[in-house]
Design a protein with these regions (language model features):
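Generic structural signal for individual residues within well-ordered alpha-helical segments
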Residues: 93, 108, 115, 167, ...
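Short, flexible helix/strand-to-coil boundary loops that buttress conserved ligand/catalytic motifs
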Residues: 70, 221, 301
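ABC transporter nucleotide-binding domain
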Residues: 171-261
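Short, Lys/Arg-enriched, disordered terminal segments
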Residues: 1-3, 302-305
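ABC transporter nucleotide-binding domains
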Residues: 3-5, 10-204, 210
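Short, charged/small-residue-rich alpha-helical element at the C-terminal edge
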Residues: 225-303
Length: 305
């Protein structure tokens, strides 16, 4: 694990921002930090970045308790972007890169590579105030990753981007992971979570209410519901399948086939169900309906009210 938090608690006046939150982030993974507004995600991120300190609990980074020098091994892109509007893009990028410990030569060399990669060489001498929100975010993304930190923390990194640039940044995040970086990814966009995250933690009301691998969580929260596209007679299916093990939820006639939704009493009945279907009709397609992370997010948060 590159990052672990143990029972982190943080109180602000009459508001308990974090209540014993523990997470474990594997190396070279994309880790989703999820939760409604005000759940405590940003407070946890600020503690990891040593912007604020916990009232109790510990943070461990790369095998040791988090210390001041670890700031150079962490890159943080906050949701609230901030660039000096009157400075030129190149000048400011150099300044921020030097703050992260890069020499002038290394900073300029790396920035030129990234500016060329993103096709933004012409921005170097522009003032920041001339950039759109999306353009400024590209600059901040670059200066966040430039010093090749072990851990990257992105808070709503796709905010303000058009679909093409969202895809660009997603691909770069996955490239960084493949190169060995670890990414903590905080967002409300559940489709992006499913696309790029390996593990997640869901925080609600200052507590960790769900953690684990994405695929495992989605399977565990399935309701044993299956869809079958078929050609044949619906009554043949109803007569064939065991009513004590399955129930037909719906059947809809399509242009070229029919679609039936069936609920099984347990997931172990999946193979038996498929064999019974094949013996009674022509099966075109058969799949289990796995809940989306959006569905699970809503279900867990509403259940925690």
């Amino acid at each position: 694990m590159i990052l672990q938090t143990e029972k982190i608690t943080k109180q602000y006046a009459n508001h308990l921002a974090l209540d014993g939150v523990s997470i474990s982030v594997p190396k070279a993974s994309v880790y989703g930090l999820l939760g409604p507004n005000g759940a405590g995600k940003t407070t946890l991120i600020r503690i990891i970045n040593q912007i604020t300190a916990p009232d109790s609990g510990k943070v461990f980074f790369d095998g040791h308790e988090l210390c001041e020098s670890d700031v150079y091994s962490i890159g943080y892109l906050p949701e609230e972007r901030g660039l000096y509007k009157k400075m030129k893009v190149g000048e400011q990028s150099m300044y921020l890169a030097r703050l992260k410990g890069l020499s002038k030569h290394d900073a300029e060399k790396s920035l030129k590579i990234w500016f060329e990669k993103f096709g933004i060489q012409a921005w170097w001498n522009k003032k920041v105030e001339e950039l759109s929100k999306g353009m400024a975010q590209k600059i901040q993304f670059i200066v966040t990753i430039l010093h090749k930190p072990k851990l990257l923390i992105f808070d709503e990194p796709f905010s303000g981007f058009d679909p093409i640039n969202v895809n660009l940044i997603k691909n770069e995040i996955l490239n960084l992971k493949n190169e060995g970086a670890t990414i903590i990814f905080s967002t409300h966009n559940m489709s992006s979570v499913e696309e790029i995250c390996d593990h997640i933690t869901l925080i609600n009301k200052s507590r960790n209410i769900l953690s684990g691998q994405i695929d495992e969580i989605r399977r565990n929260y399935g309701d044993n519901i299956f869809e079958v596209d078929y050609r044949g007679n619906a009554d043949d299916i109803k007569q064939k399948i065991d009513a004590s093990s399955y129930s037909v939820l719906s059947n809809v006639e399509q242009k070229y086939f029919q679609k039936m939704t069936i609920k099984a009493k347990n997931v172990e009945e999946k193979n038996t169900l498929l064999s019974q279907l094949i013996s009674s009709v022509e099966v075109v397609n058969f799949n289990e309906i796995i809940p989306s992370m959006n569905d699970i997010f809503i279900k867990m948060v509403e259940a925690d009210k």
